[in-house]
UniProtKB/Swiss-Prot annotation:
Source organism superkingdom: Bacteria
Gene this protein is translated from: ndk
Compartments it resides in: Cytoplasm
Identification of the protein by name: Nucleoside diphosphate kinase
Species per Swiss-Prot/TrEMBL record: Chlamydia felis (strain Fe/C-56)
Subunit structure: Homotetramer.
Family stated for the protein in its record: Belongs to the NDK family.
């Protein structure tokens, strides 16, 4: 069993798509090991996306991520990182396969409904950014 981090971004939260997106993850066989809604500060968003600090889209990404609340989840399941990324779809919703979350709910490459960890190593880092071990139910050891 693996764990991965998923974030329902401000665009999807603001359009009341939380339940639909959570249902997609559950129907795909993921177990939600932790979940909370937070409104990120600029400092928190900058810290979370620090890997992108030198990229031209960094400030736009931070501004978007602090524009409203987000739902942060730890998803658990077999091959969780890869499966989550398949379910999310391509970063650009126009290139995302039909039936994926981004194809259904994303608007643009910057406003694309969800975030998901891109590797097991990053999943562990990202999960610990938002959750303590005691907040994760039946966590993978």
């Amino acid at each position: 069993m693996e764990q991965t981090l998923s974030i329902i971004k401000p665009d999807s939260v603001g359009k009341a798509h939380i339940g639909e997106i959570v249902a997609i993850f559950e129907k795909a066989g993921f177990r939600i090991a932790a979940m909370k809604m937070v409104h990120l500060s600029a400092k928190e968003a900058e810290g979370f996306y620090a890997v992108h600090k030198s990229r031209p889209f960094f400030q736009e990404l931070v501004d978007f991520m602090i524009s409203g609340p987000v739902v942060v989840m730890v998803l658990e399941g077999d091959n969780a990182v890869v499966r989550n990324r398949e379910i999310m779809g391509a970063t650009n919703p126009q290139e995302a396969a039909q039936g994926t979350i981004r194809a259904q709910f994303g608007e643009s490459i910057g406003i694309n409904a969800v975030h998901g960890s891109d590797s097991l190593e990053n999943a562990a880092i990202e999960i610990s950014y938002f959750f303590s071990k005691t907040e994760i139910v039946n966590s993978v050891e």
